């Protein structure tokens, strides 16, 4: 893991790929973390929030800027990011219940009481960063089964090494009753938002962009949303 100082905090990278922008004060990271934080803000989970993959706590600065005070249960096998977070953002540590553990084993031991689960795992491979294989097969049904009634899953996806991006993504969406997709101008990531009932695509897009503009994130104007399921996807 390479750690570089930035104007607002630290940048964590592997093999030249940025893993996380860790701000030490409330505000935007201008990265995918802003969208993940924005979704937590606009979806307004009232109960438990789970985060699989901590990435140095990059979501905390935009969450604080958005006024979100909810605590999250976070799990990761790599302790380096959490230790950096504790050292550089001590006032935010109380907002995170972190555990070093395998995400699948940890989630299997949890009750089905999550209002929202964010899947944000990644692994380095051959000079790049990819999603682990469990993202595409083991985790989607497990996450679905650990959601409370009305709970929503948020998957931060990257193209798999062997291709099959569209097929795998749509297969994941079909495990849920309703799904939306967020894509980016700046990143190859896609964010899948899925559950029994997800806000309509226009409503979700409007709320998400408003939240991002509130904190001054450049991503407010660089995202697109659409409905994944249905005979004719709606783009907004």
Question: Predicted segments — roles?
Answer:
Residues 69-71, 93-95, 150, 176-178, ...:
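A generic structural signal for alpha->beta connector loops
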Residues 63, 172, 231-233:
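Generic structural signal for hydrophobic
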Residues 1-7, 11-31, 38-42, 189-236:
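SAM/dcSAM-binding transferase cores
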Residues 128-131, 137-201:
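C-terminal substrate-binding/active-site "lid" region of AdoMet-derived donor-dependent transferases
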Residues 17-20, 122-128, 153:
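A short, flexible beta-alpha/helix-coil linker loop
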Residues 53-56, 161-165, 201-204, 225-226:
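A general structural signal for short secondary-structure boundary/capping elements
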């Amino acid at each position: 893991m390479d750690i570089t100082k930035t104007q607002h905090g630290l940048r964590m990278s592997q093999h030249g790929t940025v893993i996380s922008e860790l701000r030490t004060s409330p505000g935007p990271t201008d990265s995918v973390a802003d969208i993940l934080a924005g979704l937590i803000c606009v979806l307004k989970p009232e109960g438990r929030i789970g985060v699989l993959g901590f990435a140095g706590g990059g979501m905390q600065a935009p969450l604080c800027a958005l006024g979100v005070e909810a605590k999250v249960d976070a799990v990761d096998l790599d302790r380096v990011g959490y230790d950096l977070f504790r050292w550089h953002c001590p006032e935010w540590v109380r907002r995170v219940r972190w555990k070093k553990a395998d995400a699948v084993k940890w989630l299997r031991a949890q009750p089905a009481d999550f209002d929202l689960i964010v899947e944000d795992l990644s692994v380095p491979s051959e000079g790049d960063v990819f999603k682990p294989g469990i993202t595409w097969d083991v985790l989607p049904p497990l996450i679905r089964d650990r959601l409370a009634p009305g709970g929503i899953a948020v998957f931060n996806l990257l193209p798999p090494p062997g291709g099959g991006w569209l097929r795998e993504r749509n297969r994941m969406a079909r495990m849920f009753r309703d799904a939306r997709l967020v894509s980016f101008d700046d990143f190859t990531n896609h964010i899948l938002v899925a559950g029994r009932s997800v806000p309509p695509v226009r409503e979700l897009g409007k709320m998400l962009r408003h939240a991002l503009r509130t904190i001054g994130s450049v991503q407010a104007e660089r995202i697109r949303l659409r409905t994944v399921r249905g005979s004719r996807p709606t783009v907004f």
